[in-house]
Regions:
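Negatively charged, low-complexity tracts enriched in Asp/Glu with abundant Ser/Thr
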Residues: 4, 16-17
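Acidic low-complexity segments
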Residues: 5-11, 21-33, 80-169
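A generic structural signal for short, solvent-exposed coil/turn residues
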Residues: 16, 46-48, 140-142, 170
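Structural beta-strand/beta-sheet cores of well-ordered domains, especially the beta-sheet scaffolds
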Residues: 20-22, 50-54, 146, 172-176
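Residues in well-ordered beta-strands of folded domains
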Residues: 25, 55-57, 149, 179
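N-terminal alpha-helical targeting/anchoring segments
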Residues: 30-90
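Internal metal/ion-chelating core segments
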Residues: 165-179
Length: 179
């Protein structure tokens, strides 16, 4: 089952199973990691990432029980089984007196700049040259040996709720660890 289709299905199924407040978040993207040791690149990895996270409550206002988990969304049967177990588990958790339910009023959020840099998506093989530059600079500053990792990723996050929120955003990250 495709990620967004699974997300829509999960929300619908949880409503039918009696869940009250539901947030289903889908993340999909691609991650890259370059490792280096003794001034040499020793490993290059990349992988696709995708996951489906759920937060939900059951019960009545003032007596809500909450839980959250990540689920596998490979097929409808697997999803149904996991959702049934999640509802059963949540009904047996203590009442969460701190949770008052999801807000029902409509919010307008300002755009948050800087969480997505399209240059990260196009790094590709140039990530090796970034590593080489970092290693060379460390050597110029007196380091005899260097090691570390360069990790970067990008993707999309979509949030779907029982209060009719359906929003998504793109994200990117980059991190260099050098020692």
């Amino acid at each position: 089952m495709k990620l967004n289709s699974a997300q829509d299905y999960v929300l619908k199924q949880l409503k039918s199973l009696g869940a009250k407040d539901i947030v289903v978040t889908a993340h999909s993207g691609e991650s890259f990691q370059n490792k280096f040791a003794n001034n040499e690149v020793v490993a290059n990895k990349n992988w696709d990432t995708s996951n489906l996270s759920i937060f939900l409550s059951v019960g009545e206002n003032g007596n809500l029980r909450t839980s959250g988990t990540d689920i596998s969304y490979s097929d409808q049967t697997a999803i149904d089984s996991q959702l049934n177990r999640l509802i059963k588990f949540t009904k047996n958790t203590p009442i969460n007196k701190n949770f008052l339910g999801l807000p029902v009023e409509t919010f307008k959020y300002r755009e948050v700049r800087g969480i997505y840099d399209p240059e990260i998506k196009s790094l590709g093989k140039s990530s090796i040259s970034i590593l080489r530059d970092a290693i060379d600079l460390a050597n110029q500053k007196g380091a005899e040996r260097t090691g570390g990792t360069l990790t970067h990723n990008y993707g999309t996050t979509r949030m779907l709720t029982s209060t009719d929120i359906d929003k998504s955003y793109d994200y990117s990250n980059i991190s260099l660890s050098l020692r």
